[in-house]
Amino acid sequence: MRSTALALLISLVSSPALAQQRAALAFVSNEGSRDISVIDTRTNRVVATIPVGVRPRGIQASPDGRRVYVALSDEHPNATSRGDAIAVIDVATRRVVARYAAGSDPEQFAVTPDGARLYASNEDAGTASATDLRTGRVLATLVVGIEPEGVAASPDGRWIYVTAETSNTVSVIDARANRVVTNILADLRPRAAAFSPDGARAYVTNEVSGTLMVVDTRTHQVLRSVELERGEGKPVGVVVSPDGARVYVANGAASAVTVLDARTLRQVARIPVGRRPWGIALTRDGRRLYAACGLANEVHVIDTATNRVVARVPVGNRPWGVAIAR
Amino acid sequence: MPAASAQQPNGDTLRIGLVLPDSAARTPAMASAARGVVMGAEEAARSAALFGRTVRLVEGADAARLVGEGRVLALLGGFGDAECRALGGLAQARGVVFVDLGCAGDALRGRECRRASFHVAPSAAMRAVASALAGVAGGGVEMWDTRLERFGADQLNQRFRARFGEGMDSQGWAGWFAVKMLWESALRARSAEPAALLRYLESDAAQFDGHKGRPLSFRPWDHQLRQPLYVAAPSADAPVEVPRAQPGADESSREVLDRLGTPREKSECRMGEARPGDRLRGE
């Protein structure tokens, strides 16, 4: 009895060694309530709420799972202030431990696989900025399309893809030189991008066309574009399964997640979820998909083996994005 | 009017002509449209630079001169049906594209339609249906509203306000959209030749984002832009968007938007019956 209590007490004490044994946590950015909901993925319950005071949107975990980065914007989209930043949440203590400057109105970003750099889109400036995560210094500011939005880093860290909603473009940044090497013409209002685990393909959602576009990352050429939900789904979030076999797309207007065969791009399942799913994230083993349903104020959890919703987790107001940290 | 640079090959430059009197003689609607066109051209130039291309805007009151010396491939303007008739005729005769920013006349899309003319401005028929659909007393029918927020509308409104110190209205949106639409057509058609632009604009592939949440396109039978409109009552907080999709109905954006205006079977436009001698440059 006593030893059980002691064991419990020890397990509650946070230490790096024990952090590896903890269940994965899902961090959800709530744009409306200006906080972050933390969901324990074993119980699918909210175990903490972290206030951030301003609008949080883009959210990503560091590769080692110890930190979660979240893009914060103040109420003045065309001016840089203290409110515009990338906040760093320490996963163990669930506290904001640092803030990085990332230009004005940062919305989306990607962390390089080595965890060393962060590339963010500055929506109102039409730029993407590269930040050194060790020093917090902005290394480069690059001109991309108008109203940049989605940012994705290739698994080898070589390429950064940045979508731009008004220009209908995807800018390709060579991360070794921090230069835009080419621009890809997308369909209407490209939103999010995701690479396949082998890095050979990139998938881009186009909100107004209602399409998913596939890019050959060797040539940065569009291979094809497929309509989802008859073109009316307003797709936003996209993720690829760890084995590369499945692509998941959140269709905001259709309140459904589409599951596609990555090879044929045929729809293999359509999963109704809560209203306006935008941000989606997979657990590292690919067995659960978490979808932030903005107008339902819930995160819906999908079992990817059965393609069914297995939990609905009430979170804050207007959940926007979700990131899974170990 | 700046002299055209002879070194610029046409394929890399889209030259657009805005037909307007001098600033002093402009109505508020013309001034708004001009602001929209200027911002549209600035943004199109930024987007074009990503692909090593150029967008050039030339302004003047003399449309024939813009087409001749200015070497424009498209004319923007039209703030009264008579002017749209004249500009549509000139564009047709000289083999360039004309984009109507402000004429509502149904006949311009009907008996008097021309293959070279494309109407961003909504027709009187569209306005009438929007008004009856909306159920808002005393509301004006608009293409745009400074209070719109969804689908990046807030971004567009903020960009316009930052650029000009005032809100974007319907005419501002029409001017901005017309340039964006022309530039994207040239890029996707891989040609800035008027004939290629026209063929692209008439094709099923031609779809545009105007920050209204639906793909916008031109009706092939009368070259009218399909677009949601907004009815704003003076007392209301936010404008009402029309048409709205029927709940539960499985309609495409095109089907929804075609509820505004003249359907194909009722159209009096005979686009294919171009007069002899009517040719577009590049054909």
Functional labels for PLM-detected ranges:
Chain B
Residues 1-283:
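Extracytosolic ligand-binding ectodomains
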